[in-house]
Amino acid sequence: MPANTTNAAARDGAAVPDGPAAVPDEAVAPLLRGITVLRRLTEADGGALSLSALERATGLARSTVDRLVATLARMDYVRLDGRDVHLAPRLMELGNAYLAALRLPALLAGRADALADELDESVSLAVGDRDGIRFIHQATRRRAISLSFRIGDLLPAERTAPGPLFAVGWTPADWHRWHERRAADPRDDRFPALPPREHVSADAEFERRAARAAVDGWALDDQLIEPGLVAISVPVRAPGTGWARGTGWARGTGWAPGTGWAADTGWAVGAAEVAGAGNVAGAREMAGAGDVEGAADVAGAREMAGAGDVARAREAAGAGDMAGAGDVVCVASVVSHTSRHTAPDLRSALLPRLRAAVAAMEDDLRTAPPAHPGPPPAGLAVWTGASKQELGREFVESLARGLTVLTAFGEGRAALTLTEIARATGLTRASARRALITHEHAGLVAPAPDRTYALTPRVLSLGFPPLSRTSLPEIAQPHLTTLAGRVHESAALAVLSDTGDEIQYTARAAGGRVLSARVTVGTRLPAHATALGRVLLADRPDATASPVLRRVREEGHALVDEELEAGLRAVAVPVRDRAGRVVAAVNIAMHAARGTTEECLTRVLPELRHTADLVEAELRVAGRFCRVAVV
């Protein structure tokens, strides 16, 4: 029987713009089904489901699920472990395309990380995603009680500190959509990153918070998500769109896709700016100085905020023509626990420092150079065609081609025409157009009046949240298992210890022989006596002082023959990160009786280098906008 793709995709309200809307006639059905598969995997614990569970979760026929999974596996977007389907790090290239086009993580993450270090609290950056907020950067603290949200997680606006700040710019249509979602999903079941609501709050409460945010210029989350969690947020605005009387905070992106920023409208000063700081004393000073109108703005804005009237609060605060300026590009938040800060304490102790960091972020945006577009993806259409020829009906070419359209975007390529997308991917205009129609229906791309298209934050719903926490051992493990199966010897991954004189094994795969190296994860050995250790030590600045390490650096591998233990031979190569630093090493360990050292290098070293290349490729994708833990 035919699968009901529309209903399966729309259950969480994420697959279509406004719930279960009719699928356009020109939409690519296999592409919609593939998006549904990726979203169900994203929502699953650990980013994995069995094929049977995936069949139930999507409502698709088992044969359809098998073909979609086979195609996604060919693209390295998922991997099969027996009958289980796991999201794979390569899938993060879709979310990376959105984050690169946005530019904000690259420009502002350093400031957020520095603030987290200064305050010893978690700091996040979020963008608005319709009636929710979605994280684009997280700088978390390691504590027994720490923040568990991930880059790409979607939260309902009303249960967060950033939400009211984004809601200030909502239109009546936006508010209507929010009310509809609240009525249809009162417990927030569509937001898997959150625990379900225990008590349903009144809509008027969020409206009051948004009206207050229009006046204060900041917002607070006092344990709205769960007991103990508190946060304070301040908006980051595009250059020239501050809280100026007569201009204010406008809707729209504020971002000129592909070129930079909205036009600079200047930084005016008035009573609204004082109100934005929550400075009542400042308003009184303005009145004392003869600025009665400015003082009235403050009082009127606060009165409207108390009534929950967002639009009138903005007007009273001096917002003026809300369509005439740029918008908030993201919101910066400091997140803490009530054991360290109460909600009032956040305002008094942390708000000034958060404001200072946001001011520095806005300066960085003002002085940011134009984006420099990198090379677009090449040969994708040829690759999909070749895969179809090789795999036949098990490869769903329309799914693969449709997903490659998302990779056409990136830094300096934030807004693209249909022709540019077709040229970048190698697709025909007709194929690219149908893919864009499908992605627009799924909420992944948005058209603009100038006939260009841009990615939306919803692209991050395709696997990014669970994969953003992927560690290097998790990346390496399936490749080590494959390597051990090919060469029939034990394979392992290791890093240097904090002291630098030992290695620590972080992942391994057994070779299946009677005589094989049996070292458990967590084992530590002297670095100088192991092939893994010598590869890691050879990357240090002082390595040239040692002839042994100098040779390892020159040859790109290390061979240790019965030095650590009689009969044990090992060869190792480095694993490098995006910056070219050696962060780990992989090795093959075997019994010395199974051939000469020359035979070992001839038979094993090429396989080992190939495995390291695969690990590095996935590490580069996973580490572009996320920290990848090495242990």
Which residue stretches match the model-derived regions?
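N-terminal helix-turn-helix
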Residues: P2-D12, D18-Y98, D363, V382-F464, ...
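Conserved segment of winged-helix/HTH DNA-binding domains
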Residues: R90-D117, L147, R458-R486, Q504-Y505, ...
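Short regulatory alpha-helical segment in sensory/regulatory domains of signaling proteins that mediates
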Residues: A112-S124, L480-H488, A492-V495, L549, ...
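Short hydrophobic alpha-helical segments used for membrane anchoring or interfacial signaling
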Residues: S124-R130, H137-A139, L493-T499, T506-A509
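Short, solvent-exposed recognition segments
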Residues: I145-P227, T506-A566
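Juxtadomain coupling helices with adjacent low-complexity linkers
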Residues: R209-A211, D216, V331-G392, A545, ...
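A short beta-strand signature within small-molecule sensing/ligand-binding domains used
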Residues: P227-P235, W243, A566-P574
